[in-house]
Amino acid sequence: AEKRLTETRATHAATGQGFHGYEIHIGRSDGPDRARPFAHVEGRPEGAESACGRVQGSYLHGMFRDDAFRAAWLGGFGVASEGGYDAGVETTLDALADHLEIHLDVAGLLVCAR
């Protein structure tokens, strides 16, 4: 089987929430849990969920960047989604920059870089 990378629009099977992601797929998946797909892509089942619902799998990546999907998925576990993805990334990067500024000799690094 050949590896493929595809941008994808999918619908989460349990919540009906649509989301965007990308698919990295090679080979074939099989087994009884495939009867319970994680999502649907263009009408075809994608991924799987265990009978107890505690294990879910998907070839789709990047789905949790979608704020609406993440909120719906977490809501299925009774957990609220806090904040948007992009804002969270910015906050994390700002905190990392502050940490580096405190613990690194930034001026010295800039001198070395010139």
Region annotations inferred by a language model:
Residues 1-49:
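Pocket-forming structural segment of enzyme catalytic cores
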Residues 46-114:
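Acyltransferase
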